[in-house]
Every structure is written in C-alpha cells, then in structure tokens.
Amino acid sequence: MSAKIIAFSAVVATASAFAPTAGFVPRLRSGATSVNMAMDKSAKAPVITIFDHRGCSRAPKEYTGAKAGGKDDEMMVKAQSVKIEVSTGTAEGVLATSLAKMTK
C-alpha cells in the first residue's frame, strides 16, 4: 500500500512541477526586453567532425595533446563554429522548393 502512495505522490509532484503558476499572465514584451532576443545574423553554425583512426596505419596529426593510453587515442571529436557561406541562387532555390512543398 505504501508503494502506491509513494508512486501517486511522485506523479502529483511531477505534474505540479510542470504546471504554470496561478499568477502567470502572458504579456507582450517591451522594446527593452526584446533587444537581447534578436536573431543572430552572424550566419555561424556548429560543424562537428569525427575522426576515427582505429586500425589506420596513417599517423594522426590532428590531436597534439596528451595520450590516454587506450583505444581513445585513435578517436577524436572536433566541434567548431563556422560561418556558412551560401550563394543567393542556392538560397532562392531552397526557398522555392520549401514553398512548393508547403502549399501541397
């Protein structure tokens, strides 16, 4: 019986954690608060490269840090932020394709 009470209490606690507060009223944001919410126009995106040299005879030159002493020495994940360059023609083609699929 106590297990049922504990399970019920957990469900109630979870539901109340995700319920909005009674005094919450959505409002329009003023100009001062929306300034920091502007879209990032830097055109940068994360680029993730995975290097897996397990079983490869080529000496890895990408990583120059200390070795772990195991199979992880032959693997590496590189994450970087790169500015994405897209031509206007490519952008127009993607837009046209997207709009054509949205009307169907």
Swiss-Prot record:
It is found in: Plastid, Chloroplast thylakoid membrane. Contains one covalently linked 15,16-dihydrobiliverdin chromophore. InterPro entries: Globular_prot_asu/bsu (IPR011070), Phycoerythr-like_a_sf (IPR037011), Phycoerythr_a (IPR004228). GO terms for cellular component: chloroplast thylakoid membrane; phycobilisome. Residues 1-37 form a transit peptide. The keyword Thylakoid applies. Keywords: Bile pigment, Chloroplast, Chromophore, Electron transport, Hydroxylation, Membrane, Photosynthesis, Plastid, Thylakoid, Transit peptide, Transport. The modification 5-hydroxylysine is found at residue 41. Residues 61-63 are annotated as: 15,16-dihydrobiliverdin chromophore. 15,16-dihydrobiliverdin binds at residues 56, 58, 78. It is a peripheral membrane protein. It comes from the Eukaryota. Heterotetramer of 2 different alpha chains and 2 identical beta chains. The subunit composition could comprise of any combination of 2 out of 4 different alpha units with an invariant beta unit. Belongs to the phycoerythrin family. Light-harvesting photosynthetic tetrapyrrole chromophore-protein from the phycobiliprotein complex. This is Phycoerythrin alpha-2 chain, chloroplastic. It comes from Rhodomonas sp. (strain CS 24).
